[in-house]
């Protein structure tokens, strides 16, 4: 198994400096990760820094709260793609889901899917805030709206990915969608366990440590 190609090498901290982003890009080139995941302000820089590689540029939309309007999320998506993004990780409207407004949750996801054209869309469900039934429902809505992946977490709420959540999400979407585990993978064994539970992508800032067989600091 080429575990490196499961990893979205991630730096989403609001105080990330250019030299830290450059280090992220250098590591991504060296280890040939699936993608780097950066905030929208760094997309153009990341695209240039990864020229000549097959490492994708992933960015986030409606991040981290998911509480912007669908029109804003669609605009963010279009601009990110214009700037070079290959993949979009969007946050659902958690409040709408909790309120039972499933039509809004679905249309919100669909707005981003439609704005993304042929680019990959991953739907962050923020599983730590949801009941198991809500997790099932929102995964079904993401599938119905045409998204490519469901993703556990932003890394900015009360918890990251769990094996149980990844397994439940995989059981819900079947083999038709990807499942991304974000947060929670701090070692090679952690990453492997997520893959065995059904993850096809792992979002982590610890990709290098994981591949080296080290235990990473932090929880994202």
Curated annotation (Swiss-Prot):
Catalytic activity of the protein: 2-deoxy-D-ribose 5-phosphate = D-glyceraldehyde 3-phosphate + acetaldehyde
State which pathway it belongs to. Carbohydrate degradation; 2-deoxy-D-ribose 1-phosphate degradation; D-glyceraldehyde 3-phosphate and acetaldehyde from 2-deoxy-alpha-D-ribose 1-phosphate: step 2/2
Q: Name one GO cellular component term.
A: cytoplasm
**Enzyme active site:** 89 (proton donor/acceptor), 151 (schiff-base intermediate with acetaldehyde), 180 (proton donor/acceptor)
Localisation per UniProt entry: Cytoplasm
This protein's superkingdom? Bacteria
What Enzyme Commission number(s) does the record list for this chain? Answer: 4.1.2.4
Pfam families per UniProt: DeoC
Q: Which UniProt keywords apply?
A: Cytoplasm, Lyase, Schiff base
Q: Which top EC class is named for this enzyme in its record?
A: lyase
GO terms in the biological process aspect are: 2-deoxyribose 1-phosphate catabolic process; carbohydrate catabolic process; deoxyribonucleotide catabolic process
State any single GO MF term. deoxyribose-phosphate aldolase activity
Membrane-crossing ranges are none
Role: Catalyzes a reversible aldol reaction between acetaldehyde and D-glyceraldehyde 3-phosphate to generate 2-deoxy-D-ribose 5-phosphate.
Family stated for the protein in its record: Belongs to the DeoC/FbaB aldolase family. DeoC type 1 subfamily.
- Tell me the NCBIfam families matching this sequence: deoC
Name of the molecule in the record = Deoxyribose-phosphate aldolase
State the species of origin. Streptococcus pneumoniae (strain Taiwan19F-14)
């Amino acid at each position: 198994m080429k575990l490196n190609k499961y990893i979205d090498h991630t730096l989403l901290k609001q105080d990330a400096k250019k030299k830290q982003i450059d280090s992220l890009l250098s590591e991504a080139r060296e280890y040939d990760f699936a993608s780097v995941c950066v905030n929208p302000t760094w997309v153009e820089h990341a695209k240039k820094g990864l020229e000549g590689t097959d490492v994708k540029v992933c960015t986030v939309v409606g991040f981290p709260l998911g509480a912007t309007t669908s029109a804003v999320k669609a605009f963010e998506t279009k601009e990110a793609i214009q700037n070079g993004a290959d993949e979009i990780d969007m946050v659902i409207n958690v409040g709408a889901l909790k309120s039972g407004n499933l039509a809004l949750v679905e249309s919100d996801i669909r707005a981003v899917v439609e704005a993304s054209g042929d680019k990959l869309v991953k739907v962050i469900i923020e599983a730590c805030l949801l009941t198991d039934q809500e997790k099932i429902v929102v995964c079904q809505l993401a599938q119905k709206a045409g998204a490519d992946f469901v993703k556990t977490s932003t890394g900015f709420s009360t918890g990251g990915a769990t094996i149980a959540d990844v397994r439940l999400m995989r059981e819900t979407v079947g083999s038709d969608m990807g499942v991304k585990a974000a947060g929670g993978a701090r070692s090679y064994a952690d990453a492997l366990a997520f893959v065995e539970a059904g993850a096809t992508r792992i979002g982590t800032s610890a990709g290098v440590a994981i591949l080296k067989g080290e235990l990473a600091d932090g929880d994202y």
